[in-house]
A protein has these predicted regions:
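Pyridoxal 5′-phosphate
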Residues: 1-176
């Protein structure tokens, strides 16, 4: 078989979707070409950039049921967001639950926080690569502050039932 004799089928869409939708390409192109640095002046391009950012914050706040658009923060990428959230949320003495399915972008900051006194429980996956919600619930302690887990594993392709975990964490007053 030679190159070109077959078409590629791309399966790793959990984090790194290869083909971006046309709307994403168009929005990035517009952002690169219009050059309206938000918050850097009072000319029309700057004001339009500021409106676009605020409108995006408003839509995200609505989608995530946040208190206000000002609660929405943009970062350079998901890894940066995870580091900010994990390191900003956890303190020595806190307990956090995660799963064996997590990506290094989650595990590395959790291990770093563990070295600083955060207690970490890693829920094991079964032979099919699934984590039991009952096992997560059994790991909850009075000092459990959060459950941090992926929705879709880029290793197994399995989805985690985040609706059930969300309901459980609400019941216990734990962040998710």
């Amino acid at each position: 078989m030679r190159k070109g004799d077959f078409s590629m089928i791309y399966f790793d869409n959990a984090a790194t979707t290869r083909q971006k939708p046309n709307e994403v390409v168009q929005a990035v192109t517009e952002a690169l070409c219009l050059l309206g640095n938000a918050g850097r002046g009072a000319h029309e391009a700057t004001l339009q950039a500021s409106r676009t950012i605020y409108d995006t914050r408003r839509k995200l706040a609505e989608f995530f049921h946040a208190e206000s658009p000002e609660r929405m923060v943009f970062t350079g990428n998901a890894t940066e967001s995870l580091n900010i959230a994990i390191k900003g949320l956890l303190n020595p003495g806190d307990h956090v639950i995660t799963t064996q399915l997590e990506h290094n972008s989650v595990l590395r900051p959790l291990y770093e926080m563990e070295e600083k006194g955060v207690e970490l429980t890693i829920v094991k996956a079964d032979v099919q690569g699934r984590c039991s919600i009952a096992d997560m619930e059994a790991a909850i302690r009075p000092e459990t502050k959060a459950i941090i887990c992926t929705h879709g594993s880029n290793v197994t392709g399995n989805l985690v039932d985040i609706a059930a975990i969300g309901a459980m964490t609400q019941k216990y007053g734990i962040l998710f």
